[in-house]
UniProtKB/Swiss-Prot annotation:
Keywords: Cell membrane, Membrane, Transmembrane, Transmembrane helix. It is found in: Cell membrane. This is Uncharacterized protein MJ0565. The keyword Metal-binding does not apply. Its main location: membrane. The chain crosses the membrane at residues 13-33, 45-65, 80-100, 116-136. The keyword Transmembrane helix applies. GO terms for cellular component: plasma membrane. It comes from the Archaea.
Length: 147
């Protein structure tokens, strides 16, 4: 893979996933702040967690820093793509573990989980975490082809 093609792949992946994580983080923060103020906003996949939104925002910023490095023709741009993807995967793994623990509570018949459903625990964290596998795999391929 030539260096110009790699740069284009890094820029496009970092832009797409940077936008996904940043916009989701901002929406999550806004919903969380409104719920703190007493207004109830419900959107599918969003739970209104301000700190979770900040985590998504941080991952989005890491992707955007990778765009800046790639535009400047810095080979370290792959590192930003790789790092942001790993952090996004970590967020997704945590969301998956929460889903599993809630499912166990439901299966054991705990009272708090009597009305639990799979789609109630399907959050933006889980979706973005699973999507972060795509840039992770591509960054891994790029880093192995440059060595």
């Amino acid at each position: 893979m030539d260096i110009k093609n790699m740069r284009n792949v890094i820029v496009s992946l970092s832009l797409v996933f940077g936008l996904l994580f940043t916009v989701s983080g901002i929406i999550e923060i806004i919903i969380g702040l409104y719920s703190i103020l007493g207004f109830k906003i419900e959107l599918p996949l969003f739970v209104g967690d301000v700190f979770g939104g900040l985590a998504l925002l941080a991952v989005g910023i890491a992707y955007f820093l990778g765009v800046k490095k790639a535009v400047d023709r810095d080979i370290k741009a792959v590192s930003y793509l790789f790092t942001a993807s790993i952090i996004g995967l970590g967020i997704g793994v945590i969301a998956f573990l929460i889903l599993i623990s809630d499912a166990i509570g439901f299966l054991l018949g705990f009272e708090d989980w009597a009305d639990w459903g799979f789609f109630n625990d399907l959050t933006v964290y889980l979706v973005l975490g699973m999507l972060a596998i795509i840039p992770y795999r591509i960054a891994k391929i790029i880093s192995s082809s440059t060595t």
